[in-house]
Regions:
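Mid-chain, well-packed structural core segment of small domains
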Residues: 57-90
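Short, glycine/acidic-enriched loop or turn micro-motifs at the edges of active sites
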Residues: 28-30, 43, 52, 96
């Protein structure tokens, strides 16, 4: 991870804590899959992908969350829920951190769990 990414994840975690979320894990890994932030609020497990950009010159940060990235996040979330035997609804959010003033945008319920045929 780079310094900018870590700073953005720190900003996102601080923001979530201020908003009443309980941070359960950061940079949780399952093989090659990673969850940036795992949080809980109101009985909902929230899986957060953080995207940090210096500027929007190459598009919005959230546009960098590809279908393949979503699949890896969902698989990591599945591993997390199974490992810790979590029995609560799961929501997937994206938090973007943009620019030198580190403007935060919290996209709640950013994507739904896709179903793949194997």
């Amino acid at each position: 991870h780079n310094v900018l990414g870590h700073t953005g994840e720190d900003d996102a975690a601080d923001y979530l804590a201020r908003e009443g979320y309980h941070i359960l894990d950061r940079n949780w890994r399952s093989g090659h899959k990673e969850i940036d932030i795992v949080a809980e609020k109101g009985g909902v497990l929230v899986i957060v992908e953080v995207k940090t950009r210096r500027d929007a010159r190459f598009g919005k940060p959230e546009d960098a969350v590809s279908e393949n990235k979503i699949r890896r996040i969902v698989l990591a979330a599945d591993a997390y829920v199974r490992l810790y035997r979590i029995d609560m609804p799961v929501r997937f959010d994206i938090i973007t951190v943009l620019g030198k003033y580190r403007q935060i945008n919290h996209i709640i319920d950013a994507f739904r769990t896709p179903v793949w045929y194997r």
